[in-house]
From Swiss-Prot:
Gene3D superfamilies: 3.40.140.20, Methylglyoxal synthase-like domain. It comes from Synechocystis sp. (strain ATCC 27184 / PCC 6803 / Kazusa). The IMP cyclohydrolase activity resides in the N-terminal region. GO terms for cellular component: cytosol. PANTHER family: BIFUNCTIONAL PURINE BIOSYNTHESIS PROTEIN ATIC, BIFUNCTIONAL PURINE BIOSYNTHESIS PROTEIN PURH. It catalyses: (6R)-10-formyltetrahydrofolate + 5-amino-1-(5-phospho-beta-D-ribosyl)imidazole-4-carboxamide = 5-formamido-1-(5-phospho-D-ribosyl)imidazole-4-carboxamide + (6S)-5,6,7,8-tetrahydrofolate; IMP + H2O = 5-formamido-1-(5-phospho-D-ribosyl)imidazole-4-carboxamide. Pathway: Purine metabolism; IMP biosynthesis via de novo pathway; 5-formamido-1-(5-phospho-D-ribosyl)imidazole-4-carboxamide from 5-amino-1-(5-phospho-D-ribosyl)imidazole-4-carboxamide (10-formyl THF route): step 1/1; Purine metabolism; IMP biosynthesis via de novo pathway; IMP from 5-formamido-1-(5-phospho-D-ribosyl)imidazole-4-carboxamide: step 1/1. Its EC number is 2.1.2.3, 3.5.4.10. One of its GO terms (biological process) is 'de novo' IMP biosynthetic process. SMART domains: AICARFT_IMPCHas (SM00798), MGS (SM00851). Residues 1-146 form the MGS-like domain. Belongs to the PurH family. This is Bifunctional purine biosynthesis protein PurH.
C-alpha cells in the first residue's frame, strides 16, 4: 500500500515542490484541506480533499475540517500494537506516515495596527495544533513537519535510507511541541494584555536564530533567539557587510534603535552609542552634519561605537564614518555610493533595518526564582502637558532644545543627566549613584560650551545642589520630572539664579 501524507499549511512556501516529490519519487498518496488542496490541484498534483477522505464536509465556515477519527486515528495509531491495527481495519482508516502542518498567522495578525479581537480570534488555529501534537506524540511511528526548512532534510533521509530515522522523527517532534507551545503562549499573552493588567501566567518562547560566540564576556555562553515564526525586528535586518554580530553588538544596536526612534525621520538625526549609553546625539539639516556633530560631541568615546541614523546612509556620511573605527552602523537604507565607501572597512558591520520604529512592547529581566515584566518606556510625551515652574518662561527655541535634551536623557542609564545646545549633546552623565555626581560629569564634558546650554535630568532633584551647580557652569534651562519633597527648594534656587525650569511629570529611570 502506498504511504499516506496529510498536507495542510498556512505558509505554502515549498509545499508544491514537496508534494510533487512525495508523489513522483516516493509514491505517496496525498490528502489535504482548504487552500492547500486548491494550491496543489492548481499545480497538477494529485490530491484528495480531507472532506472526501473522511466523508464529513467542512463545516462552520471551515472551522472544522480535520477534527475527525479517520484523521486522528491514522495519526495516533501504533503500528506495533495489534489492537490499534484492528481498530484501523474495522473503521477503514489508513495510517498516516507524514503530517505537514503549519499554523494560522496569529502573531502576524495581532501585530497589525488596529486589529480587532474578532480578527485575532479568527486566526487562532484549532485543527492544526491538534494534528501537530498528535503526530509529535506518535513520533515512534510517524513524522510531523511544521516548517518549510525541514522539507529538504525529510526528503534527503527518505531518499538515502528509504525511511525516516527515529532520531530525526524525534527531532521534528521536539520542534513541533516547541511551535505549539510558542503559539499557545502568544495567544495567552495577547488575551492577558487586553486587560492591561499583569497576567497570572506569562511565558516567553523563541527559536534559536544564531549561536553567538559568547555573551557579554568570553566566559559566558549566549544565543540569539527569534520570537514568532516570521523574522521581525533585528532578525529581519539585512547585514550588508562585516563580521558576525556579537551579543554586545545586538544589545547596543537595540539601545541605539530606541534612541533614534525618538526623532522625526524628516529631520536628519545621528546617534553614537557605547555600552548602551549615548555619547553623541545630534540633529542637523543634512545627515553628514548630524553625524559629524554627534561624533564631535565626544570623539574619544565614539571610537569603537555603534551608530544609528534615521535616514538612508549616503556617500558623504559614509565618507565621514570611515575616518574612525566603528563597530556597527544601522540605518533604514544605504545608497550605492555609501556601500562602495564602506566596503573598504570590511570588518565594519553595516545593517539595514527599514522599520526602526517597531520594537518590543515589554521588557523582561531575570531574577532569582523568576523574572520581571514591564511595559516598554516608549510612550510619546505631549510637551503641552509640561509645567513651567519658574518665573522665567522659555522661548520657543529653548522649549525645542529642552524637548531634544529630554528625549536623549530618557535613554541614559540612571542617574542620568544630559547637557545639550543646538540639538547636539555636549555632556552626558550616566549611571552615577548620586545625581549631582552625574551633573558634574556632564558639565565637565561640556566644558565652556555649557554656557547657555540646556540640562535634562531623568528623575527629580532631591536637593537644590544640582540646580546651583548647573547654574554656576552657565546652564540656563532645566527639564526634569519633578516630584521631590524638596521641589520648592529647586524652584526657589532656579528663580534666584534666573533659570527656566520645566517639570514633565514623567520619570525615566533606566537600570
Amino acid at each position: 500500500m502506498a504511504r499516506l501524507a496529510l498536507l495542510s499549511v498556512s505558509d505554502k512556501s515549498g509545499i508544491v515542490e514537496l508534494a510533487q516529490r512525495l508523489v513522483n519519487e516516493f509514491q505517496f498518496d496525498l490528502i489535504s484541506s482548504g487552500g492547500t488542496a486548491k494550491t496543489l490541484k492548481e499545480a497538477g498534483v494529485p490530491v484528495t480533499k480531507v472532506s472526501d477522505y473522511t466523508g464529513a464536509p467542512e463545516i462552520l465556515g471551515g472551522r472544522v475540517k480535520t477534527l475527525h477519527p479517520r484523521i486522528h486515528g491514522g495519526i495516533l495509531a501504533r503500528r506495533d500494537l495489534p489492537s490499534d491495527q484492528a481498530d484501523l481495519e474495522a473503521n477503514d482508516i489508513r495510517p498516516l506516515d507524514l503530517v505537514v502542518v503549519n499554523l494560522y498567522p496569529f502573531e502576524q495578525t495581532i501585530a497589525k495596527p488596529g486589529v480587532t479581537v474578532a480578527e485575532a480570534v479568527e486566526q487562532i488555529d484549532i485543527g492544526g495544533p491538534a494534528m501537530i501534537r498528535a503526530t509529535a506524540k506518535n513520533f515512534a511511528h510517524t513524522t510531523v513537519l511544521t516548517n518549510p526548512n525541514q522539507y529538504e532534510a525529510y526528503l534527503q533521509a527518505l531518499q538515502e535510507q528509504g525511511e525516516i530515522p527515529l532520531a530525526l522523527r524525534q527531532q521534528f517532534a521536539g520542534e513541533a511541541f516547541a511551535l505549539t507551545n510558542a503559539y499557545d503562549q502568544a495567544i495567552a499573552n495577547y488575551f492577558s494584555g487586553l486587560s492591561g493588567d499583569s497576567a497570572n501566567q506569562f511565558g516567553l518562547s523563541g527559536t534559536l536564530r544564531q549561536p553567538l560566540r559568547y555573551g557579554e564576556n568570553p566566559h559566558q555562553s549566549a544565543g540569539w533567539y527569534q520570537t514568532g515564526r516570521e523574522a521581525t525586528g533585528w532578525a529581519k535586518a539585512e547585514k550588508l557587510q562585516g563580521k558576525e554580530l556579537s551579543y554586545n553588538n545586538l544589545v547596543d544596536l537595540e539601545a541605539a534603535r530606541r534612541i533614534i526612534n525618538e526623532f522625526d525621520v524628516r529631520e536628519p538625526a545621528a546617534v553614537i552609542l557605547k555600552h548602551t549609553n549615548p555619547c553623541g546625539v545630534a540633529l542637523a539639516p543634512t545627515l553628514v552634519e548630524a553625524y559629524q556633530k554627534a561624533f564631535n560631541a565626544d570623539a574619544t568615546s565614539a571610537f569603537g561605537g555603534i551608530v544609528a541614523l534615521n535616514q538612508p546612509l549616503d556617500g558623504p556620511t559614509a565618507a565621514a564614518m570611515v575616518k574612525t573605527f566603528l563597530e556597527c552602523i544601522v540605518a533604514p537604507g544605504c545608497d550605492a555610493e555609501a556601500q562602495e565607501i564602506l566596503a573598504k572597512k570590511n570588518n565594519l558591520r553595516v545593517l539595514i533595518l527599514p522599520d526602526l520604529a517597531t520594537g518590543p512592547s515589554q521588557t523582561i529581566k531575570a531574577i532569582a526564582g523568576g523574572f520581571l515584566v514591564q511595559s516598554a518606556d516608549d510612550e510619546r510625551e505631549d510637551p503641552s502637558t509640561w509645567q513651567v515652574v519658574t518665573e522665567k518662561q522659555p522661548s520657543g527655541e529653548e522649549l525645542a532644545e529642552l524637548a531634544f535634551a529630554w528625549k536623549v536623557c530618557k535613554h541614559v542609564k540612571s542617574n542620568a543627566i544630559t547637557i545639550t545646545k543646538n540639538k547636539t549633546t555636549l555632556g552626558v552623565g550616566a549611571g552615577q549613584m548620586n545625581r549631582v555626581g552625574s551633573v558634574e560629569i556632564a558639565l565637565k564634558q561640556a566644558g565652556t560650551e555649557a554656557q547657555g546650554a540646556c540640562l535634562a535630568s531623568d528623575a527629580f532633584f532631591p536637593f537644590d545642589d544640582s540646580v546651583r551647580t548647573a547654574a554656576a557652569a552657565g546652564i540656563t534651562t532645566i527639564i526634569q520630572p519633578g516630584g521631590s519633597m524638596r521641589d520648592q527648594d529647586s524652584i526657589q534656587a532656579a528663580n534666584e539664579l534666573g533659570l527656566v525650569m520645566i517639570f514633565t511629570g514623567v520619570r525615566h529611570f533606566l537600570h
